[in-house]
Design a protein with these regions (language model features):
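Catalytic cores of secreted/periplasmic or lumenal enzymes
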Residues: 2-334
Length: 334
């Protein structure tokens, strides 16, 4: 899961007209429920939405970055904001892991949200819930679906560098490896394909797909499942050496609009990452889902919303477990 500008007013208008999914969830699981802050911090969601809207208006790419933060958080020890912790004392930050190093971003936006919430209602709204809300609002601001976010997560007091290195799907993972990592989180193949659709916005670095252009299988040959004129275009900006940090749209057709173009690109053999292309080359079931979403944007939106709620429910800390951090970058002083 990886990352041009609209006016602030247009971004806000999308909030009013976006498709909505209540997703029919039972919110009793894990003690998460949408009204968690209705009395303790009634302005919480409005504060998050306002700051996310400002950040995305300043930089469209930030929407994908905030969405990715939530994904990378939930896949390591559950949705507990462990990804936000800086290295300190006994804690080795997940920001140092291979999937995150010099790649994940949006921490300053989270800091701004947390600061505003602490002023409004101190020691109340968790960093984990901030990530869940920011992911939803970012999707909406790019024209994607909305959904009701179950709330009440608490923040971890630790991080897992090994979990971040091992549990987050990598751009060059095989389909089976990616599916195994999803199943470990209680997610299935439908969730895998739908959530991969988040690549309809955002960017990837040259280093994430260079092997496809020059040495896919270790034999000095490119990945021939990649459409050749598209591959040639990519090679012009992603050479064999150098240009490691050059950015490329994950969806070159509509890179800042959340829609089903990503799936149409896959069917045309124009998925940027190997982990994108395997959705149509390695499994008949996943290819069938790609075809359905490519044909029906509404169906994609509906399933994406359901899968985001499902992902957001991975192993939350509730009750007396964890804490409500005052600063999302460090645990509270005991």
């Amino acid at each position: 899961m990886a990352q041009l500008s609209m006016s602030f007013l247009l971004a806000l208008s999308l909030l009013a007209f976006t498709p909505f999914c209540s997703c029919g969830n039972n919110y009793q699981d894990g003690n998460l429920y949408p009204q968690f802050y209705d009395h303790s911090c009634p302005k919480a969601q409005a504060i998050v939405k306002s700051i996310v809207a400002k950040a995305v208006a300043n930089e469209a790419r930030m929407a994908a970055s905030l969405l990715r933060l939530h994904f990378h958080d939930c896949f390591v020890k559950g949705c507990d904001a462990s990804i936000l912790l800086d290295s300190n004392g006994q804690i080795i930050s997940e920001k140092r892991s291979n999937p995150n190093r010099n790649s994940v971003r949006g921490f300053e936006v989270v800091d701004e949200i947390k600061s505003a919430l602490e002023k409004e209602c101190p020691n109340t709204v968790s960093c984990a819930d901030i990530l869940a809300l920011a992911a939803r609002d970012s999707t909406v601001l790019r024209g994607g679906p909305s959904w009701v976010v179950p709330l009440g997560r608490r923040d971890s007091r630790g991080a897992s560098l090994s979990g971040s290195n091992n549990d987050i799907p990598a751009p060059n993972n095989t389909f089976q490896t990616i599916l195994t990592k999803f199943k470990k989180q209680g997610l299935d193949i439908v969730d895998l394909v739908a959530l991969s659709g988040s690549h309809t916005i955002g960017n990837a670095r040259c280093t994430s797909f260079r092997q496809r252009l020059y040495n896919q299988s270790g034999n000095g040959q490119p990945d021939f499942t990649l459409q050749q004129s598209y591959a040639a275009q990519l090679r012009s900006q992603c050479p064999r050496s150098g240009g490691d940090q050059n950015l490329f749209f994950l969806d070159f057709v509509s890179p800042t609009t959340f829609d089903n173009s990503y799936f149409k690109n896959l069917l045309a053999s124009k998925g940027l990452l190997s982990s994108d292309e395997v959705l149509v080359t390695s499994s008949g079931v996943s290819r069938g889902l790609v075809q359905k979403y490519a044909e029906n944007n509404e169906l994609f939106f509906e399933q994406f919303a359901k899968s985001m709620v499902k992902m957001g429910n991975i192993s939350p800390l509730t009750g007396s477990r964890g804490e409500i951090r005052k600063n999302c970058r460090r645990v509270n002083k005991s």
